[in-house]
Design a protein with these regions (language model features):
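Rossmann-fold dinucleotide-binding core
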Residues: 4, 65, 91, 97-133
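Short, well-ordered alpha-helices that flank and scaffold nucleotide-derived cofactor binding pockets
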Residues: 18, 22, 76, 107
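Short, conserved loop/helix-junction motifs that constitute active-site signature segments
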Residues: 81-86
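Beta-loop-alpha module in the N-terminal Rossmann-like domain of NAD(P)-dependent dehydrogenases
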Residues: 61-79, 95-102
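Short gly/ser/thr-rich secondary-structure transition/capping motifs
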Residues: 42-48, 72-76, 115-119
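NAD(P)+-binding Rossmann beta1-loop-alpha1 motif at the extreme N-terminus of oxidoreductases
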Residues: 1-63, 89, 94, 125-128
Length: 133
């Protein structure tokens, strides 16, 4: 099983992490508000203090945040995902962001020698919990 990093543990992201844990994956997660993710830590997720540390611990890192500004906040800077990516790693963004923001981020990921997949999702919590997203 791959080591997974997950940044953005809101309504949808938290349910995705729960399904990954249930499938036996090792998940290191980060959320701006740690208390909202405590139930995932209790379920076996390892807590990360920064998005960078989540990416460093992972073979594949996911983001599921609300908008372009939120994505830029977790991706950039000395504690951002980009600082934790290394050559050969995979980054998958499932956030709702502009195509221009995705292209800009993909260029930064490529400069690190990593790969990026832009994979926005739509659906409901029940669809996700049923594994049909």
């Amino acid at each position: 099983m791959a080591n997974v990093g997950f940044v953005g543990l809101g309504v949808m992201g938290s349910r995705m992490v729960k399904r990954l844990l249930d499938a036996g994956h090792k998940v290191t997660g980060y959320n701006r508000t740690k208390s909202k993710a405590q139930w995932l830590v209790d379920a076996g997720m390892k807590w990360s203090e920064t998005p960078r540390a989540a990416a460093q611990a992972a073979d594949v890192t996911f983001t599921m945040v609300t908008n372009t500004a939120a994505l830029e906040a977790v991706a950039n800077g000395s504690d951002g995902i980009l600082a934790g990516l290394a050559a050969g790693k995979l980054y998958i963004d499932m956030s709702t962001v502009s195509p221009a923001a995705s292209r800009e981020l993909a260029a930064k990921v490529a400069a690190k020698g990593a790969k990026m997949l832009d994979a926005p999702v739509s659906g409901s919590v029940s669809t996700l919990e049923e594994g049909k997203l």
